[in-house]
Amino acid sequence: MTLREELLEEHWSYMDRYEAQMIARGPTLDHDTPTGSVHVVDLPDPVAARAFAFNEPSYQAGVYRDVLLRRWRNLLGRTMWDFPGGRTGGNRYLVLGLGAGPAADLAVPPERDQLIAYGPLLSDDGTAWLGTAVLIRAQDPHVAGAILTADRYADIEVHSWQFGGRPS
């Protein structure tokens, strides 16, 4: 059993405290092997966001080496639980567009029914665009990554992702 598996109940209990603020959550995967985790949480300020991320039991125990912490704007105005496609079926991806230059992809694309979460990554004070984060159901990683305007980003990362949280 991995450390991540050993701490799963403790992780879920910690996340339960943020249930009302949770927009999306779940692991990134390489096939069936977890490679990371996504948590999109509506918190009041950068101090609360840092406390949420760095007090999480798995992070404290060393399960994660790095944490990317960014302000994000929810352009869909919903949570992953409101996604009309449900928790299962199809391939799901995290797409991270890391900004380079002027802001891009600020409007919700026409594929809205395939979007689980969508919005810009922003500086702590919310004034500077740093990129775009998307959770999407798509045929494959190439189609998922194509949701963003490629030449407007320094890099676009695409990771397999699945809905997280306690089993229903």
Can you name each region flagged by the protein language model?
Residues 1-168:
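Conserved, structured core segments of small domains
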